């Protein structure tokens, strides 16, 4: 999981989700997992 100041979709399968006030990206590709920090 990468922690970035700005998160964005990398591919078509990435999904942006708000969880506990944080924006996270989940994807079938584990390299695309991101969280806003």
Curated annotation (Swiss-Prot):
Subcellular location: Plastid, Chloroplast
Source domain of life: Eukaryota
One GO cellular component term noted in the UniProt record for this chain: ribosome
A Pfam family matched in the record: Ribosomal_L36
Gene Ontology terms: biological process: translation
Principal place of residence: plastid
Repeat as UniProt keyword: no
Coiled-coil intervals: none
UniProtKB keywords: Chloroplast, Plastid, Ribonucleoprotein, Ribosomal protein
Gene Ontology molecular function: structural constituent of ribosome
PROSITE patterns in alphabetical order: RIBOSOMAL_L36
HAMAP family named among the record's database cross-references: Ribosomal_bL36
PANTHER family reported for this sequence: 50S RIBOSOMAL PROTEIN L36, CHLOROPLASTIC, LARGE RIBOSOMAL SUBUNIT PROTEIN BL36C
Family under the similarity heading: Belongs to the bacterial ribosomal protein bL36 family.
Protein name per the record: Large ribosomal subunit protein bL36c
């Amino acid at each position: 999981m990468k922690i970035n100041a700005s998160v964005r979709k990398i591919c078509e399968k990435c999904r942006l989700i708000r969880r506990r006030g944080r924006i996270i990206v989940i994807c079938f590709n584990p390299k695309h997992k991101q969280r806003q920090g």
